[in-house]
Design a protein with these regions (language model features):
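Conserved small/polar residues in nucleotide/adenosyl-binding loops
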Residues: 116-117
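Conserved N-terminal diphosphate/IPP-binding helix and adjacent helical/loop segment
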Residues: 1-78, 83, 87, 91-112
Length: 117
C-alpha cells in the first residue's frame, strides 16, 4: 500500500521562516516591514494542493530521505508562486477578498492609508 504524509503546519512554518529570512535582509524600514507583513498574511491558509502535488511526485519518485529538505524547499517555492498568481488574479478581477480576508492589494491599500499621517 502506498501512502504519502503531508504536514501543512510544517509547510506554513517554513513559508513564514522563508519570509522572515527575506525580512531580515531588508533595511528596517516601515515600508518593507509592511510588505513582509502582507506576504505573511497572504500565504496563510488554502488547501496547499500544489505543495501536495510536489510531495506526491517526490514520494512516487521514491524520494530519498536525504532529499526531503529539497522537497520542502520546492513546496515553499510553489506556494509562494501560487500566492503571487492569486494576488495578480485579485488585482485583475478587482477582488476585495481572498479566502474571506482582504485580498493582498486591499491589505496593502489599508496598510498604506494607515501610514499616511
Amino acid at each position: 500500500m502506498f501512502s504519502v504524509t503531508f504536514n501543512s503546519q510544517k509547510l506554513s512554518d517554513l513559508i513564514s521562516a522563508e519570509l522572515a529570512q527575506w525580512r531580515a535582509k531588508w533595511p528596517s524600514t516601515t515600508v518593507l516591514n509592511g510588505l513582509a507583513d502582507g506576504l505573511v498574511h497572504y500565504t496563510k491558509g488554502g488547501k496547499r494542493l500544489r505543495a501536495r502535488g510536489v510531495q506526491l511526485g517526490f514520494s512516487l519518485a521514491d524520494g530519498a530521505s536525504q532529499l526531503e529538505d529539497a522537497c520542502l524547499t520546492g513546496q515553499v517555492a510553489v506556494e509562494l508562486y501560487q500566492a503571487s498568481a492569486l494576488a495578480h488574479d485579485d488585482i485583475v478581477d478587482n477582488a476585495d477578498l481572498r479566502r474571506g480576508a482582504p485580498s493582498l492589494h486591499r491589505f496593502y491599500e489599508s496598510w498604506h492609508r494607515s501610514e499616511e499621517r
